[in-house]
Curated annotation (Swiss-Prot):
Protein name: Type II restriction enzyme HgaI
Keywords: Endonuclease, Hydrolase, Nuclease, Restriction system
Catalyzed reaction equations: Endonucleolytic cleavage of DNA to give specific double-stranded fragments with terminal 5'-phosphates
Superkingdom of this protein's organism: Bacteria
A biological-process GO annotation: DNA restriction-modification system
Known EC number: 3.1.21.4
Keyword Hydrolase: yes
Alphabetized GO MF terms: type II site-specific deoxyribonuclease activity
Length: 488
């Protein structure tokens, strides 16, 4: 195959293969929810004991596959399919559910809504994936590409399993030219007989059998059980064998490849088409190795996907939480406006955000020479100011003298600067000043977790305490830890 699609034979998409049963993932997620999402070794051992007694889960006895490894596989499955991610607080691992993960658990008794929610989870999945090291070689949205191909009329609305593990999973990145080449390659493969294609697989069985196993035994059944895929198992099979390990006395393990195919379920076709019109398969994924951002900030952004299109589709109220989650994206969008005409929108959404606190009154102040938002912390009648710093690039400096004048005008005690990212020297600009920094996605995450936990009485007290103890610093880490301690 041409290099336009391939790195080499060894660099292919790797799909998680630790479960093909959505109910098991649900049970693990519900267990985490009911146990404060702690995933320490002690908690994992307890999970192993509980799930070992479940009809859903019967782990094999193995010297290699210890209980800790087994549970890690299940947690990795949740993270892989975008239910959430792990973070640390006070040297303890916690699992943070994503907005879509929470929404999925909310509608467990509605199969139609679950199909649409999980479709969005797949749409949000990117390579490189934070929980799939082999995916770091790629730069695309794998399931957006799969869905795009399934909707391509030239391919008759279907993808044969053979086409996935022989052609598609070798795609490194995608653009229009590569996509057309991919379609052409698939159409050309359909000119071959099935005997010819299955014989090809036999000739390279040691290279392809793992992908056959991942796709046909795990991904396809999982998406079939969620009513995302319609599955045809074909009528021709070919046994493929895994390489035998050195010194093994057991016969090589066989897997069955067949001439089956998948289609998108009829009731999802229009919805997925709408999603792809909004979230293109050509979009560039977020880089995990962004040297300008902390890795946990990158992870937060990846898992913050929460499309209003989905909320409208399932009849979920398009509430303010969706705007909160979009703050980092809105910053980027507004800052690209050449005449900066959208900067006021960022300030307005922050005004709404701080008015979510029951003990804060926030008011946007228009005009030059003034702070962006004036706030009153009601329990002690103390004012503070907010400066909204939307910027296409990293915030390069803070004029602490100017912010002090802004505080003096309204008799504010301190200033909160909210920005997507900044250069390290900005920390020196606020050192020993009555100023703190918070990254936008950190604030969004804290407010969102309050909202989805049905905590409508959000108090500012904890944030106030953090600020008073950390003036002159970036308090994003402390706010993240607060989120984890309350909702992790």
């Amino acid at each position: 195959m041409e290099k336009i699609l391939m790195l080499n034979d060894d660099q292919i998409w790797i799909f998680k293969k630790h479960t093909n049963n959505i109910q098991l993932l649900i049970e693990v997620a519900l267990y985490l929810k009911s146990n404060k999402s702690s995933v320490s070794k002690k908690d994992k051992d307890a999970m192993y004991d509980i799930f070992s007694e479940s009809e859903l889960y019967n782990p094999r006895e193995s010297l290699r596959d210890k209980p800790l490894d087994t549970i890690n596989h299940k947690l990795d499955g949740l993270s892989y399919f975008m239910f959430g991610y792990s973070d640390r607080i006070n040297d303890e691992n916690k699992f943070i559910f994503s907005p879509l993960g929470n929404l999925f658990l909310k509608y467990l008794h509605d199969k139609d809504k679950l199909s649409k929610i999980f479709s969005c989870m797949l749409i949000s999945m990117q390579f490189p994936h934070p929980y799939s090291k082999p995916s770091e070689c790629f730069l695309l949205y794998p399931f957006r590409l799969i869905f795009k191909l399934l909707l391509d009329k030239r391919l008759q609305g279907r993808l044969y399993h053979y086409e996935v593990y022989k052609i598609i999973i070798h795609t490194i990145s995608i653009d229009e030219a590569k996509y057309e080449f991919l379609v052409k390659s698939i159409l050309n493969s359909r000119k071959k007989s099935w005997n010819e294609k299955l014989n090809e697989l036999s000739e390279i069985q040691h290279k392809v059998v793992k992908s056959v196993y991942e796709w046909q035994y795990y991904i396809v059944p999982l998406l079939g059980s969620l009513h995302i895929f319609k599955i045809n198992n074909g009528d021709i099979e070919q046994k493929l064998y895994h390489p035998q390990k050195d010194g093994s006395k057991s016969p090589p393990t066989a897997r069955k490849a067949n001439n089956g195919y998948v289609e998108i379920n009829d009731n999802l076709t229009n919805f997925i088409d709408k999603l792809l019109n909004k979230y293109s398969f050509l979009d560039t994924p977020i880089l995990l190795s962004d040297s300008q951002r902390k890795s946990n900030d990158v992870t937060k952004e990846i898992y913050s996907f929460y499309p209003e299109l989905l909320l409208a589709e399932i009849g979920e109220t398009i509430s303010f939480e969706s705007h909160i989650l979009n703050i980092p994206k809105l910053i980027t969008e507004y800052s690209k406006n050449p005449d900066n005409s959208t900067s006021g929108k960022f300030e307005k959404i922050l005004e709404e955000a701080f008015n979510l606190f029951i003990d804060v009154e926030a008011q946007w102040l228009a005009g030059a020479g003034r702070t962006d938002i004036e706030c009153m912390y009601l329990p002690i009648n103390e004012k503070f100011s907010i400066e909204a710093k939307s910027t296409k690039n990293k915030l390069s400096m803070i004029n602490s003298g100017r912010l002090k004048r802004h505080r003096t005008l309204i008799s504010a005690n301190y200033t909160i600067v909210i920005t997507p990212r900044y250069v390290p020297s900005v920390r020196y600009d606020i050192e020993a000043q009555d100023i703190v920094l918070i990254t936008a996605d950190t604030l969004a995450e804290y407010l969102y977790n309050n909202i989805i936990s049905n905590n409508r009485d959000i108090s500012y007290a904890d944030i106030q305490a953090i600020i008073v103890a950390n003036l002159g610093k970036d308090i994003s880490t402390q706010i993240s830890n607060l989120t984890l301690s309350k909702f992790g």
